[in-house]
């Protein structure tokens, strides 16, 4: 069972934040869409409805694996799969970025964040500190003057990293924590 803390709503946007949480119903749809595209995910059995009286959430299958990065890099049980994980992650990201946003309905429940959105929001936050740093000023202005244009937007997990991947001796068994996924530049998942 995946629920919001306190059983309430987990979606929304906090003023001044760059990322948006699409909510648990959207997270369930993300996992279902990713699984249908060949991304390893738990099976989502049921998305809670308001009539259920249990708050927002969903029920999914239990998967066996390890998500703690320190254990993944040291566990003798995972020694054989470790050299193959980078390749598996590349395959998984390619599948995520190729998901048809319109056909899955994700375009209706996810926010779009462009590189320009990130640069402008970060620049505005920096300026609010009113402590000029010449190199940051130079870099910020350069980024503002060289924003990418004409990018093809895709589904972005936005937190694809050790700790959000469940690993077993067979490889990646699940991509976890979709709460900051959005539509944007897929390069966000590579940095």
Task: Identify the meaning behind each predicted range.
Residues 154-155, 161, 166-191:
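Active-site Asp-x-Gly
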Residues 1-155:
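ATP-binding pocket architecture of kinase catalytic cores
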């Amino acid at each position: 069972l995946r629920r919001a803390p306190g059983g309430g709503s987990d979606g929304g946007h906090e003023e001044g934040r760059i990322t948006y949480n699409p909510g648990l119903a959207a997270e369930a749809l993300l996992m279902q869409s990713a699984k249908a595209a060949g991304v390893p995910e738990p099976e989502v059995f049921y998305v809670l409805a308001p009539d259920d009286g249990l708050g927002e959430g969903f029920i999914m299958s239990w998967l066996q694996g390890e998500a703690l990065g320190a254990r993944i890099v040291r566990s003798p049980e995972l020694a054989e799969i470790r050299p193959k994980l980078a390749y598996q992650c590349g395959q998984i990201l390619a599948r995520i970025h190729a998901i048809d946003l319109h056909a899955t309905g994700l375009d209706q429940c996810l926010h779009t964040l462009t590189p320009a959105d990130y640069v402008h929001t970060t620049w505005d936050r920096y300026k609010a500190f009113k402590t000029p740093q010449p190199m940051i000023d130079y870099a910020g202005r350069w980024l503002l003057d060289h924003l990418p244009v004409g990018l093809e937007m895709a589904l972005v997990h936005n937190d694809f990293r050790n700790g959000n991947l469940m690993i077993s001796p067979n490889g990646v068994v699940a991509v976890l924590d979709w709460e900051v996924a959005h539509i944007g530049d897929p390069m966000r998942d590579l940095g």
